[in-house]
Amino acid sequence: MTFKHIVRIADTDLDGNKSLMFALTGIKGIGLRAARCIVNELGVDGRAKLGELDDETIEKVKKFVEEEIESLPSWLLNRRKDPYSGQDLHLLSKDVDFARMLDIERLIKMKAYRGVRHARGKKVRGQRTRSTGRKGRTVGVVRRKR
């Protein structure tokens, strides 16, 4: 059994020096709470370093994260009642970004208020826009001649 410095799970390189629970949080879409539930579901020690785990355990974790993660309780999943399929899903890595992009495109297409704000590049969540959040070059004020 050799120490693995980098372990690849769900298209993400994870640090083998971190404990299993904290290493799993390196995957986009898995936070600390989901990582803890995954570890408990598999019955693996979450404090063990990821690089020290045997190949069988790593394969077990990899299989669960990539295929069986939706067997977790629905309140833990990050995309409940998907607008396209109606199912409870848990998205990982690139799928999170892609789903977010599709949601924003859907809002823009239906001309919802949030979609209009996104399309114009304005703040979406009700923040004030008079003084903060300005983009582009700063234009100085020119003093008039006397």
From Swiss-Prot:
What family is this protein classified in? Belongs to the universal ribosomal protein uS13 family.
Protein name from the UniProt record: Small ribosomal subunit protein uS13
Q: What keywords were assigned to this record?
A: Ribonucleoprotein, Ribosomal protein, RNA-binding, rRNA-binding
- Region Disordered: what ranges? 119-146
Question: One Pfam annotation, family name?
Answer: Ribosomal_S13
Q: How does it assemble?
A: Part of the 30S ribosomal subunit. Forms a loose heterodimer with protein S19. Forms two bridges to the 50S subunit in the 70S ribosome.
What species does this protein belong to?
Archaeoglobus fulgidus (strain ATCC 49558 / DSM 4304 / JCM 9628 / NBRC 100126 / VC-16)
**Is Ubl conjugation one of the keywords UniProt gives this record?**
no
Gene Ontology annotations of biological process type: translation
